[in-house]
Amino acid sequence: QEKVDAAFTYDNIKYSGTDAVANKDGLTDDLQMPRTSALGVDGKYYKVEYSASTDDVTFNGYKGTVFRPEAGKGAVSTKLTCTVTDKNNAEVTATKTLDFTVTPQDQADLDNELKLMEAAKAGYAEAILDGQDAAGVTANMHAFQKAYLDADGKLAWSFDKATTDAVGSGIVPVELEGYDDMSGQQWRLFKSSNTGVVSVENLLVTQPEYNTKVTITSRLSSEKYARYAERYPDNATYAKLANQDVSATVTVLGTSGQVAPEVT
């Protein structure tokens, strides 16, 4: 109990992915809870669990997902509890509870995210074309990982994990409707209407004999706000930030340079 009392403190609860201490008087982001090492216990012998008194915070291991009230609503209070249990004797347990307040969302932040979503949808074709003309694709296209705003507030695209992890939250491709990992289908985030010409997922181009139109389809969601579409299903703002279908039709130039003759 002494170890839990000493280590489960406000200073040891950080915002996920940062070293910033979470604001107990106004939580705004997801949480990284103290691991066994931080609590001074051996994970081999002790189990650490976290729980909340309300569904404003949910836990999966050491990650706490924070659900903020809708913009314009009041702040909410919740209690976060750390429970350490001896794996060999469940009666040996220690707990400690801390009080937190969850801050409502900011309408201006939501408005900015809506603008980012619209920009990502509008720029989808340009992003995957990788500098090519939609009417004359001759090389591989490029699947992106995230759309975000750069330091100058301009739309930017991440194509690699290092950048994706470094730039913070943004708009990301999510599983397309109908995807089933058990079905053996190859597409998940980037679907192609003609896989013989443009491959799914990585969008590699195989030059056809004739000029061929191909449609690429994805579904975009806000990393930060998509979860709220399910929590607040009647809120139109959140609906626009989750599962937004987008597509781009391109023409891949064939070796003949001709349009396929119509069969009569």
Model-based region annotation:
Residues Q1-T264:
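Beta-rich interaction/scaffold domains
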